[in-house]
UniProtKB/Swiss-Prot annotation:
Broadest EC class assigned to this enzyme: oxidoreductase
Name of protein: Iodotyrosine dehalogenase 1 homolog
GO biological process per UniProt: potassium ion transport; tyrosine metabolic process
Subcellular location: Membrane
EC number: 1.21.1.-
GO molecular function: iodotyrosine deiodinase activity; oxidoreductase activity
Residues engaged in binding FMN: R135, R136, S137, C138, R139, S163, V164, V273, T274, S275, R315
Organism taxonomic ancestry: Eukaryota, Metazoa, Ecdysozoa, Nematoda, Chromadorea
InterPro entries reported for this sequence: Nitroreductase (IPR029479), Nitroreductase-like (IPR000415), Nitroreductase/BluB (IPR050627)
Bilayer-crossing regions: 42-62
Length: 325
C-alpha cells in the first residue's frame, strides 16, 4: 500500500508548518475538475497563485536589500564619526565626545571681519595699547555706584572667550550684598593672616606687626560696590555616573578673565586680581556653589577713589618679551 507523501513548499524537515501545502492545492484543483470547471479556469488559478508567490518573493527580497542598505549606512556613519573625532584630536574615549556635542554636530556659518586698511589697523592697535598701559591694580575704591547693566555687558564680553571644546566652563558670581562681602572678607583675611604668619615665624613676627596688618587686610573686598567671584568647573557628570576632571578648564577661564580685565579697563573701571588661596571652599559654601565648581579668582570692581595710590610699575619693553623667528 502506497504511502501518501505531501509535497511542501518553503518547508523543512524540522517539523515546522509549511507556508504552502501542495497536496491541499492539488485536492482543491481536482474539486474544480469534478465540478466541471474548464481547464482554462484551472490555469487562471495557477497563474494567479504564481503571481502571488512572485510578489511575495519580490517583497521579501526588497526588505532584505533595505536592511542591508541601512546596515551599510549605519556602518558608514560610525566610520565617519570616528574620522571626525580623530581629525579633531578628541581621542579614543567616546565618553569625551558626549560632553562636546558640537564636535560632531557643529554648524558652520559665514564669518566676515570688516576690511580695514593698514593705517587704521595700526592706529587702532596703538590706541588700544595706550588705553591698556594705564591699567593698574587698584585697592581703593570710591562709593560711586556702577550700573548693573554695565556689569552684565562686561561679563558678556568675558563670555566671548574661547574655551576647550566650547565648554564655557566659567561662572561669574556678582556680589553686591554688604553682608556677604563682609563674610568673604573675614574668611580671606583670616586665611591670609595665617599664611603670612607661617612665613614670619620667630621674634621677627613681633617687629612686623604693623606691616602685617597692612599686608593681610583686604578692605577693598567690602569697599568696592561689586565683588566678582570667578568659578570654573572641575568635573562634570557623564551619563549621571562617571565624573571627569577637566584640568584645562582653569586655562579657559583664565583666558576669559584676561578679556574681562581688558573690558573693565575699557569702560573706566578698576579692579585688583585677588587669589582665594585656601579660602575657596569656605567662600563656595557661603555662595552655595555646586561641588563641581572651584573658585579661581576674586575681582573687586568699581571706580577708583580720587586719592588712590598705585605702584610706579616699569613694564618690560616689547623687545624683551618677544622672539621673532
Amino acid at each position: 500500500m502506497k504511502k501518501h507523501t505531501h509535497h511542501k513548499a518553503y518547508g523543512d524537515s524540522t517539523g515546522k508548518e509549511p507556508l504552502i501545502d501542495l497536496q491541499s492545492i492539488k485536492l482543491w484543483l481536482n474539486s474544480f475538475g469534478n465540478q466541471g470547471h474548464s481547464s482554462e479556469a484551472v490555469l487562471n488559478v495557477l497563474f494567479t497563485l504564481g503571481v502571488i508567490l512572485f510578489v511575495i518573493y519580490q517583497v521579501a527580497s526588497l526588505l532584505h536589500r533595505m536592511n542591508k542598505r541601512v546596515e551599510k549606512q549605519l556602518e558608514s556613519r560610525t566610520k565617519q564619526r570616528k574620522v571626525e573625532v580623530a581629525d579633531k584630536h578628541v581621542g579614543d574615549e567616546m565618553v569625551f565626545t558626549d560632553l562636546h556635542e558640537n564636535v560632531i554636530r557643529e554648524r558652520m556659518i559665514p564669518y566676515r571681519m570688516p576690511v580695514i586698511n593698514d593705517d587704521i589697523t595700526l592706529r587702532n592697535s596703538q590706541i588700544f595699547y595706550e588705553e591698556m598701559k594705564m591699567r593698574r591694580s587698584c585697592r581703593q575704591f570710591s562709593s560711586r555706584d556702577v550700573p548693573l547693566k554695565v556689569i552684565q555687558n562686561l561679563l558678556k564680553t568675558a563670555g566671548t572667550s574661547p574655551s576647550v571644546g566650547n565648554l564655557q566652563p566659567w561662572t561669574f558670581c556678582v556680589v553686591s550684598s554688604d553682608s556677604i562681602k563682609t563674610m568673604i572678607r573675614k574668611i580671606l583675611e583670616a586665611d591670609e593672616r595665617d599664611n603670612y604668619v607661617s612665613r614670619k615665624k620667630g621674634a621677627s613676627w613681633v617687629v612686623d606687626v604693623s606691616q602685617l596688618q597692612d599686608t593681610w587686610r583686604r578692605p577693598y573686598i567690602t569697599d568696592a560696590p561689586y565683588l566678582l567671584i570667578v568659578c570654573h568647573e572641575i568635573f562634570r557628570d557623564v551619563h549621571s555616573k562617571t565624573e571627569r576632571v577637566f584640568h584645562y578648564n582653569q586655562i579657559s577661564t583664565s583666558i576669559a578673565v584676561g578679556i574681562l580685565l581688558a573690558a573693565i579697563q575699557n569702560v573706566g573701571l578698576s579692579t585688583v586680581v585677588t587669589s582665594p588661596l585656601n579660602a575657596g571652599p569656605d567662600i563656595s559654601r557661603i555662595l552655595r556653589r555646586p561641588e563641581n565648581e572651584s573658585i579661581l579668582l576674586l575681582l573687586p570692581l568699581g571706580y577708583a577713589s580720587e586719592d588712590v595710590l598705585v605702584p610706579d610699575l616699569k613694564r618690560k619693553p616689547v623687545e624683551h618679551i618677544t622672539k621673532l623667528y
